């Protein structure tokens, strides 16, 4: 049986938390801020947590993180 390999594209985007979840940078933050409200820009500052539905699926893809 071959070794499980980590998906490298996903590994660059997600970090595993101590509780077993995954966090990533927010989308929609690279350009075109003039079309976004102050509230939107403020809320996009932090990192986003992956929802629990996707954590099981990504746990296999990112098994070695």
Swiss-Prot record:
One of its GO terms (biological process) is translation. Residues 1-26 are annotated as: Disordered. Keywords: Ribonucleoprotein, Ribosomal protein. Pfam families: Ribosomal_L35p. GO terms for cellular component: cytosolic large ribosomal subunit. GO terms for molecular function: structural constituent of ribosome. InterPro entries: Ribosomal_bL35 (IPR001706), Ribosomal_bL35-like (IPR021137), Ribosomal_bL35_CS (IPR018265), Ribosomal_bL35_sf (IPR037229). Belongs to the bacterial ribosomal protein bL35 family. This is Large ribosomal subunit protein bL35. It comes from Oenococcus oeni (strain ATCC BAA-331 / PSU-1). The lineage of its organism: Bacteria, Bacillati, Bacillota, Bacilli, Lactobacillales. The gene is rpmI.
